[in-house]
Amino acid sequence: MIIVLSPAKSLDYETPPHVKKHTIPDFVDDAAELIGGLRRLSPQDIASLMDISDQLAHLNFQRYADWSPTFDSSNSKQAVLAFNGDVYEGFDAKSLSASDLDYAQQHVRVLSGLYGLLRPLDLLQPYRLEMGTRFENSRGKDLYAFWGARITQALNQQLEKKKGGSRVLINCASTEYFKSVKPKQLSAPVITPVFEDWKGGRYKIISFHAKRARGLMARYLVENRFDTPEQMKAFDSEGYAFDAQASNDSTYVFRRRVAD
C-alpha cells in the first residue's frame, strides 16, 4: 500500500525537527532544472505567474536564488515536518514515533511541483511551485508536461517492492496534484477517500475539513500498519464514518454530521 499526499504552501522552518534521520530527494536534477528556469523570472513575473502578492513573490524570488543542489540541515528540513498546511495538521508528523516515521518513509509519498515525488524524510528546501502552475519549461507548457510519466514510474517502483498485503495506491492528494499521476499506467488500483460534511441540508466537500481529513486518514493508515484497503473503512477520526451506500470500489466516502 502506498499513500500519496499533496504538499502544502505553508512551511515551518522554525520548529526544530524531532528526528535526525533524513534522505535526499530522488529528483534533485529535475528540481535544479526547474529552479534554473524560475531564476530567470523577476519578482513581478513570479507574482503574475502564481497569482500571489508582491511580498510573496519577493520571498520566493529569494528562495529560488538561495536554492542549492546540496541539501543539509542548514538549508533543509524533512518534508513531512516542513509542510505545515491543513493536511499536515491532520497528519501531525511531529507527534509520530520514530517507528511510525520509518513506516511512513516506506508507504507515504508527497507529490510536488518542484521535487516530483518526495518521501516523508526527504530534505526539503523552502519553495513555492504548485503543480497546476502553467510554467513553460524545456519539456512542455506546464509542470504536468515536465514530469510526464516520471512520477508514475517512481510510484510503480515503490508498489512493486511491496511484498504481502494489497498492492494498492491510496489517493489522499488533491485533484490538482493527482493529475500528475497516470492511473492507467499504474501497476495497482487506486482508491480515493472522499470526506463530506453535512451543511445546508446536504453532504458536501468542505475544503478545509477535507484537507485535514486526508491527513488524518494518512496518519490512521500509518499508525495501524494496514495492508488491505478494506481496513480503511473503520476510519472514524473526528466523527467521520464510512458510508457504504455513497461509496464504490474506487471511491470510499466518509461522512460527518454535526449540528448546523
Swiss-Prot record:
**Biological process GO terms, please?**
response to hydroperoxide
Q: Which Pfam families match?
A: H2O2_YaaD (PF03883)
Give any Gene Ontology cellular component: cytosol
Q: Which HAMAP family match?
A: UPF0246 (MF_00652)
Family matches, as PANTHER family: PEROXIDE STRESS RESISTANCE PROTEIN YAAA (PTHR30283:SF4), PEROXIDE STRESS RESPONSE PROTEIN YAAA (PTHR30283)
- Which family is this protein grouped under? Belongs to the UPF0246 family.
Q: What is this protein called?
A: UPF0246 protein Bphy_1979
Species the sequence originates in: Paraburkholderia phymatum (strain DSM 17167 / CIP 108236 / LMG 21445 / STM815)
